[in-house]
Amino acid sequence: MTNIRKSHPLFKIINDSFVDLPAPSSISSWWNFGSLLGICLAIQILTGLFLAMHYTSDTATAFHSVTHICRDVNYGWVLRYLHANGASMFFICLFLHVGRGIYYGSYTFSETWNIGIILLFAVMATAFMGYVLPWGQMSFWGATVITNLLSAIPYVGTTLVEWVWGGFSVDKATLTRFFALHFLLPFIIAAMVMVHLLFLHETGSNNPTGIPSDADMIPFHPYYTIKDILGLVLMLMALLSLVLFAPDLLGDPDNYTPANPLNTPPHIKPEWYFLFAYAILRSIPNKLGGVVALVLSILILAAIPLLHTSKQRSMAFRPLSQCLFWLLVADLLTLTWIGGQPVEHPFIIIGQLASILYFLIILVLMPLASIAENHLLKW
């Protein structure tokens, strides 16, 4: 008699995805982040669901409902800070996951990669709308500044902004629709994750060497289940340390002041995980140009498979490309720092140079380095 996990229509899908899945024997801890992202999504949906039970999406009561959650709801403060810092962990895992994909050439699985880019946009949109919900000063002004960018679109811009706002400014209608969309999007993301995995399992995983590993596969369970559990324990330790010891470390103090349309905060800035894109946006003096650069800063990921000029898939054996990759990482850290600084000398010029370097590395230097490496290896 066949084992039920191999014969039952539903269990069979789970078995083929998490138990008997053939996986390369050489994949390192950089391959842990996919499962960690799945767990982050589950944590966000669960904590978000319980927070939504106590939250009210009305401009008059939103701020106080969050205060009520923290003060009066049983373990409400844990839920709130798990959700807020869970978003930070989500983005840390996302950036590492994408970085791994670039370093080891996983982007050559074009369907998986493109769905991943759409997922990244969806998660960023969800996080942005979530930041608006507590209705603090930074929530309100962040929403005003970022939604206002749509007005840079020629001809339809102003109409589009007022349509998004549901009025002539960020107000009650905006908050209500942002709450509705913030609740809905994670479930759409979960469905897209299924598609992401579906495409991945069509090809199988890549590995650090970038060489096909069909001849050397091992079952996912128990080898990678136990490896993923180790990654999970380490991530949860980091998340819980953040939640229990420094819950406001990554937040903005301005968000503890209720939203006031008559008082603009001195420095409007988004959460830390958007600062690199915000720095690129601010580094261009023209409004439309800034918006285009902002979108391209993420959309450029779609160009990476098209610009792959190397005869090798992975960067594991390509020192020139490795140097450029780590230069790109340093550049992104610089942009993140600049995004949190005021618009004054010397931050303006540093931001502009870092923005130019970002696009230059991806569009020009990396493809050229790959061609040079091909010649050095006489390929």
Curated annotation (Swiss-Prot):
An example Gene Ontology CC term for this record: mitochondrial inner membrane
CDD domains documented for this protein: cytochrome_b_C (cd00290), Cytochrome_b_N (cd00284)
Segments crossing the lipid bilayer: 33-53, 77-98, 113-133, 178-198, 226-246, 288-308, 320-340, 347-367
Required cofactor names: heme b
Amino-acid positions noted as binding a ubiquinone in the UniProt annotation, renumbered to this chain: 201
Subcellular location: Mitochondrion inner membrane
Example of a GO biological process term: mitochondrial electron transport, ubiquinol to cytochrome c
Keywords: Electron transport, Heme, Iron, Membrane, Metal-binding, Mitochondrion, Mitochondrion inner membrane, Respiratory chain, Transmembrane, Transmembrane helix, Transport, Ubiquinone
Domain of life: Eukaryota
Cofactor note: Binds 2 heme b groups non-covalently.
Molecular function (Gene Ontology), one example: ubiquinol-cytochrome-c reductase activity
Annotated positions binding heme b b562: 83, 182
Topological type in the membrane: Multi-pass membrane protein
Binding site for heme b b566: 97, 196
Function statement: Component of the ubiquinol-cytochrome c reductase complex (complex III or cytochrome b-c1 complex) that is part of the mitochondrial respiratory chain. The b-c1 complex mediates electron transfer from ubiquinol to cytochrome c. Contributes to the generation of a proton gradient across the mitochondrial membrane that is then used for ATP synthesis.
Quaternary state and interactors: The cytochrome bc1 complex contains 11 subunits: 3 respiratory subunits (MT-CYB, CYC1 and UQCRFS1), 2 core proteins (UQCRC1 and UQCRC2) and 6 low-molecular weight proteins (UQCRH/QCR6, UQCRB/QCR7, UQCRQ/QCR8, UQCR10/QCR9, UQCR11/QCR10 and a cleavage product of UQCRFS1). This cytochrome bc1 complex then forms a dimer.
Additional information: Heme 1 (or BL or b562) is low-potential and absorbs at about 562 nm, and heme 2 (or BH or b566) is high-potential and absorbs at about 566 nm.
Similarity annotation: Belongs to the cytochrome b family.
Name of this protein: Cytochrome b
Organism: Rhinolophus ferrumequinum
Designated gene of the protein: MT-CYB
